[in-house]
């Protein structure tokens, strides 16, 4: 990222602490530049295995091994017009399979937010979650989410609930034990009211209309304050 900033000067801003990114501005357009990563150093992981700093730069081969899902580990070379696939990601896409690279338990420990990403991708793409993930994705392992900062957890939750498939993902949030980590004081139950609002939210997103996430949270709390 520092080298990118040296090239673009004031038009570049480095963001992120856990993983630095370079934001390059060209007029009104924003281009996000991510540098290839190498395996993290032991010293920057928490007691539960969560990666606290991931700014160890490396090669494309090292970077591919650091990706979370196979479908996120493909690289496009625009000048040559080719896609580099090191992990049979194309097969996973054709078979509509969501697969983590490496040991799923270790990948969740490295970054518990990957649990939310698992549900988001599965619901949005209508992919089947790989059996190796299902074996370890228990309500107990969701306790790892308690180590995630509230700000990051909120951001990832927003992506989960505003992707246009809220009706599909809500039952998954309950079944996989995520609900109790996000809404500790709300009963894990999809009422007809919540289902109606979720359906309406999805429809508005699909129609290109704006939504207010606060409205959905208000519906979740409706029974609490009646």
Question: Where in the sequence are the language-model features?
Answer:
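Catalytic cores of the polymerase beta-like nucleotidyltransferase superfamily
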Residues: 1-226
